[in-house]
Amino acid sequence: MRVALIGATGLTGRSLVPLLAADHQLHLLTRRATGLDARETIAPMEEWPARLGGDPVDVAISTLGTTWRKAGSWPAFEAVDHDAVIGFARAARAVGASQFITISSVGADPESRHQYLALKGRVELALADIGFDRLDIMRPGLLRGPRGGDRRRGERIGVALSPLTNLVMRGQLNRFAAIDATTVAAAMVALVGAPREGRFVHHNPEIRALVG
């Protein structure tokens, strides 16, 4: 299938690219060269929708996201996690994408008092309004994997303690447990081209089930 991806250089994206490239025609839209084995369009984030315009797409995927440390302000954070994702999704739909797969967050809710979770909830609503035949929303817990120095102090502590905390997060709490980014990437690949139409939300248990 013809797959377009944004977020290839992030924690999940780096695992996702080789899996997608093995079986699909993959097109990466990125702000800088990735060194990954896939076709790349290198352009400022604001230009991605226009750069996608000439190529038909079957499935569009976003693993794009920034950190507060990188963004430096809420408007800059929102420009990446909301505006760039929605702009890419609309452009992908315009060139034929029938499925969109994205990473959100456990607890995403447009009515949340938590600014980040409210933003993720608004992104989900906006994506649902674009008109994809199938929308897959991944809502993992804390993602484990090598991020270098990009993690907040609380995230670093959470990842370090996750082998212990995951032991007590059972039942409904399991959706809040830490999960490997490689597992999320494999689940996203498993969803590419899924036949049923609709909006599907995948928490940790569903993500792990997709990988088997």
What are these model-derived regions, one by one?
Residues 12-16, 88, 123:
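Hydrophobic residues within alpha-helices
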Residues 6, 29, 63-64, 100-106, ...:
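SDR active-site strand-loop-helix element
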Residues 1-22:
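N-terminal Rossmann NAD(P)H-binding glycine-rich loop of SDR-like oxidoreductase domains
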Residues 25-31:
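Short, hydrophobic beta-strand segments that form beta-sheet elements in well-ordered domains
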Residues 95-99, 131-133:
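A short helix->loop->beta-strand "cap" motif at the edges of active sites that frequently abuts
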Residues 8, 24, 110-212:
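Oxidoreductase cofactor-interface core, primarily capturing Rossmann-like NAD(P)-dependent enzymes
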Residues 34-35, 39-87, 91-94, 109:
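NAD(P)H-binding glycine-rich loop region in Rossmannoid oxidoreductase-like domains
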